[in-house]
A protein has these predicted regions:
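Blade-terminus and WD-like Trp-Asp/Gly-His loop motifs, strongest in beta-propeller folds
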Residues: 25-34, 73-81, 188-195, 230-237
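PDZ/PDZ-like peptide-tail recognition elements
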Residues: 331-373, 377
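A short helix->beta-strand "capping" segment at the edge of beta-propeller domains
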Residues: 163-182
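A flexible loop/linker signature enriched in serine peptidases of the S9 family
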Residues: 1-3, 8-20, 29-32, 37-50, ...
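Terminal targeting/pro-maturation regions of precursor/exported proteins
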Residues: 93, 262-326, 330-331, 361, ...
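Conserved blade-ending motifs and adjacent loop-strand segments that build the rim/top face
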Residues: 23, 60-74, 176-186, 218-233
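Conserved PDZ fold ligand-binding element
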Residues: 378-398
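Predominantly a core beta-strand signature of beta-propeller blades
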Residues: 3-9, 57-61, 113, 174-175, ...
Length: 398
């Protein structure tokens, strides 16, 4: 940022953007490496995880080497391991799309791997030994004069971040599946100590927030219906923040308590301007991403200008979606189009299963035909073709 120089870390041939926001990468704790979802063995729709050096040298290692989908890699345990999502063990639709995922962990450090696998009792003994050692060192430090102690604090504050060292040759022997069963997964976070995994998973209706405790070997449901979302741990590793469905929640790691975070935000809703932006964004997406650089030889700029003229005359998203579909149809390509479904907050109304006489001009609804096996075909019904429905729930139909 200071020099304003730009360098290529990973060649574009390894990346393919199908939709907005589908590219994932994360900086290492020492700011010298990236974990990136990229195209390798499995093609653009079955990504792998690559470790890439940030200096632009091109040094890279395919960490997963899988024909399955491996994605959403995150550094954990101070860069000594990564967690990621993979569908290698999940149920899948072989005749179509979709598969269940699990969260896995890969260790780049043998000592971190051994420590992670300690039992609750082994960890307690190790913590006790560390406490005794820290106490002895503290007693020794207290005997030193204040000046030397201050110098030591200054040295500690100025201590640079240790560069990460990777034992990649043995990485495949240090892979563990962290989730107890496959599911449709959202985001996941491993705590700083590596003792708990928080993840969003959908088993029934929508995503729920789950916690797995590795030392207790327990899995429990924390929040129902969180709707997927994204999770972020704080710097101290004491809390996790969940952003989902327009809501914020704080999860206290120590006691697994969840609290909502209240906030207020206002924005100026300008639907006409919003549609104008979406129109131009769609046009640019085609220009940037259509498989044929020549766009089938059509004058795409001309079509953009031609359809743009309709924008001032459109006052709803249904007509807007139709207009977008018409413009995209000029491509004569598959899998193109636009649709709009409004989010309804009103209760669903019942369908009686009847066709009505459109030529009837009186009050109410005159039934012309009753659909077979519908609600009006019950044995005890008195409703027949020719009947007029005058009221619904006591309200007159005019």
């Amino acid at each position: 940022r200071k020099t304003k120089q730009v360098r290529t870390v990973l060649d574009g041939k390894y990346l393919y953007s199908y939709s907005d926001g589908d590219q994932h990468f994360q900086w290492s704790p020492d700011s010298k490496w990236f974990l990136v979802d990229y195209i390798s063995v499995g093609g653009w729709n079955n990504t792998d995880i690559v470790l890439v050096k940030a200096d632009g040298s091109g040094e890279m290692t395919n960490l997963t080497e899988s024909g399955y989908s491996d994605n959403n890699a995150k550094w954990v345990l101070d860069g000594k391991a990564m967690i990621w999502s993979s569908d290698r063990a999940g149920y899948r639709s072989h005749g179509s799309w979709g598969a269940e995922d699990d969260i896995y962990i890969m260790f780049f450090d043998g000592e971190a791997y051994d420590k992670f696998r300690l039992t609750k009792e082994e960890q307690a003994l190790l913590d006790e030994e560390k406490e005794d050692k820290d106490k002895d060192e503290k007693d020794k430090d207290s005997k030193k004069d204040k000046d030397k102690d201050d110098d030591k604090k200054d040295e500690k504050a100025d201590k640079p971040v240790e560069p990460l060292k990777f034992d990649l040759a043995n990485r495949k022997d240090r892979i563990m599946r962290l989730t107890v069963n496959s599911s449709f997964l959202g985001d996941a976070v491993l705590t700083q100590k590596g003792d708990k995994l928080y993840y969003c998973a959908a088993f029934e209706n929508g995503y729920d927030l789950w916690e797995h405790n590795f030392k207790e070997n327990t899995t429990k449901l924390l929040i129902k219906g969180v709707g997927g979302g994204t999770m972020f741990p704080d710097k101290k590793g004491e809390n996790i923040f969940l952003v989902s469905g327009g809501q914020l929640k704080k999860i206290e790691i120590k006691d697994s308590k969840t609290k909502p975070i209240a906030f207020k935000a206002e924005f100026s809703y300008r639907p006409a301007k919003e549609r104008e932006y979406i129109f131009h964004h769609t046009w640019r997406q085609v220009l940037d991403k259509f498989y044929d650089p020549k766009i089938h030889g059509i004058n795409w700029a001309g079509y953009g200008k031609a359809y743009e003229k309709f924008l001032p005359h459109i006052n709803n998203n249904y007509d807007f979606a139709e207009m977008l579909s018409e413009m995209l149809g000029e491509l004569n390509g598959s899998h193109t189009g636009a649709r709009y479904r409004s989010a309804s907050s009103a209760p669903a109304t019942a369908s009686l299963g009847a066709f009505y006489d459109n030529n009837y001009t009186g009050d109410g609804l005159k039934i012309e035909e009753i659909i077979a096996k519908g609600p009006l075909t019950k044995a005890d019904t008195k409703i027949k073709p020719g009947c007029i429905i005058e009221k619904i729930d006591g309200t007159n139909i005019k």
